[in-house]
């Protein structure tokens, strides 16, 4: 390896310092060696390239150089960066040998760092640049060299009409959303105000209810104490009904206990007393009634014995029925009940007419039947004559045409018939009264009645 010495007056700072990373060995060594650099004279040592490095293509070398220029462009002004780009273009026209010479002039100087650290740093930088493709370096160079045209800028600034419509629609929707949000805020504020008012009214109501006087509370408590409970009223009514009505055939065994009468009397006496004593008596009576209830299971067993009978009766009911039937049998026997009616008439008992009187009675009976028949025939003849007379009169009126001249003639006829009937009834009543007064014999009555029947009666 050849070493060439030279001065570093034209170089402001070493190239390796720009690539140093914070925390690395190079940066730490730089911070420790600063006073030494100020005291010693700067020198540059140029080393011959290694055999593998000289065979690299020219494009990769140009890419490495452009990458270095990009890193340094951030620390330079635009004018300095433009001058550097012009120098790079002029330098790209030279061959690879000129590039190697220029590389030696920049790197080969007396550096205060050890040779091992410099070699490690160079290897790391070469590996990083080798990983990057050459196309990226060429695109970067073209972007730096070729400025944008005015037409491209105008195309970028142009806005699609669809985008404009979408933007307008978004703005309209934003306005609607803002209005909805404002309305929602107003509704929430109103709801909060209403809740506050309701809470205030509730507090006022509670204060007013708690501010009632002691006298009002006492009156209400007394009124509620006077009102009886429904269950107690029903119990009292049921007890009274049971005491008033006693069934002939009770379906359950009677409670033969004088305690119930005592309870009923105490109930009537305590109705005028205090309400508290009344309630206590009702409760005790109700509890006693529950204890004295009849066992309905035993009652059902007794009823099941006579399940085939037409009427189900208890043992007590059967005994009572037998007693009643015995009393009836003692009063009258079955023979008297089922005997012939003709046996009731016994000769020598009651009224027994003599044979002459018996013949007279038979004659009277026959004459009465004859009178009845004559009466019926007379009534029928009279009715027929009246009907014929009425028909004859109606026919005459129709012929003469005087029906309209006498409208009340029918009423007069009816009244006359009623008068005649009343006269007959009076005569019959008068005859009966005379019979009762004078005790007229049946024969004279029959003769008189027959005489009156034989006489003509005109309506």
UniProtKB/Swiss-Prot annotation:
The keyword Coiled coil applies. Residues 162-202 form a coiled coil. Residues 276-289 have a biased composition (Basic and acidic residues). This is Fibrous sheath-interacting protein 1. It comes from Xenopus laevis (African clawed frog). The gene is fsip1. Residues 1-54, 252-289 are annotated as: Disordered. InterPro entries: Fsip1 (IPR026246). It comes from the Eukaryota.
